């Protein structure tokens, strides 16, 4: 059950307009942010289109019909629900401090209705996956431009000891100006100055795009840019050929032909 259109959050600061996507761990809404803009004419109230992601671990929770509060089915489920909610909040707060022209901007992280929400900028456009579904394989110059832009975004987060760990066409948006933007850091990891993991994450794999290190959770306990670089290469292969790459675990275990 989704939040209804017109539902308000943060005491009226945000208003839900409609659902734009959902998965096993969350629901994404388009919304409106009511804010003030100061200028030569004084302070003006304005509405800014935004995207709001709601943490909703659907296998373990449900929504009350009248209050819209998110409830967990069992105490066992509560442990997992809370664990990943805290991880989501922690990673979103990190991203709220990361500003790059090829990464979606996080505006705010907050808790309400028994769950967590991330308010972020709304990017008019479509994902590379949607573009491929509509147009087929993409021209090489266009692919190289997008890959270069996402590579710049990855270099930026890697310098801050952050791994994305889910690079794939559906997590790259192309905005109305034709610029690539990296989204969905839901399974990302952050590392300390000694390059040791400081945040745990669920083991989530996008087959064909995940590096072999990601098949063993210990493979990403120490910082290395290799998983993201592999996934970016797999994404480029997919965009140029229209084919999903062979899973890295199979490439590593199969004898060479």
Regions found by a protein language model. Name each.
Residues 17-23, 28:
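Protein kinase glycine-rich loop
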Residues 62-97:
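AlphaC helix of the eukaryotic protein kinase fold
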Residues 109:
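Activation-segment/catalytic-loop signature of the eukaryotic protein kinase fold
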Residues 113-127, 131:
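Conserved short submotifs of the Hanks-type protein kinase catalytic core
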Residues 146-147:
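Activation segment signature within eukaryotic-like protein kinase domains
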Residues 158-174:
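Catalytic-loop of the protein kinase fold
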Residues 198-214:
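Conserved activation segment of eukaryotic-like protein kinases, specifically the C-terminal portion
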């Amino acid at each position: 059950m989704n939040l209804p259109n017109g539902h308000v959050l943060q005491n009226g600061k945000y208003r839900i307009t409609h659902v734009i996507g959902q998965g096993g761990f969350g629901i994404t809404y388009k919304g409106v942010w009511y804010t003030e803009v100061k200028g030569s004419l004084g302070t003006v109230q304005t509405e800014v289109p935004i995207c709001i992601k709601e943490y909703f671990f659907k296998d373990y929770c449900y929504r009350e019909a009248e209050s819209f509060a998110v409830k967990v089915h069992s105490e066992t489920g509560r442990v997992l629900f809370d664990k990943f909610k805290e991880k989501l909040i922690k990673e979103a707060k990190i991203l709220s401090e990361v500003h790059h022209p090829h990464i979606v901007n996080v505006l705010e992280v907050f808790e309400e209705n028994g769950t967590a929400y991330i308010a972020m900028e709304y990017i008019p456009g479509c994902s590379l996956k949607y573009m491929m579904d509509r147009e087929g394989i993409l021209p090489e110059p266009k692919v190289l431009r997008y890959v270069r832009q996402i590579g710049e975004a990855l270099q930026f987060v890697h310098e801050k000891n952050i791994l994305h760990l889910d690079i794939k066409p559906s997590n790259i948006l192309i905005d109305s100006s034709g610029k690539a933007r990296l989204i969905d850091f839901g399974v990302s990891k952050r590392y300390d100055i000694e390059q040791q993991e400081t945040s745990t994450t669920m083991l989530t794999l996008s087959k064909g795009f995940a590096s072999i290190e990601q098949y063993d959770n210990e493979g990403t306990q120490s910082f290395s840019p290799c998983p993201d670089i592999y996934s970016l290469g797999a994404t480029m292969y997919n965009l140029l050929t229209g084919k999903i790459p062979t899973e890295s675990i199979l490439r590593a275990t199969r004898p060479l032909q």
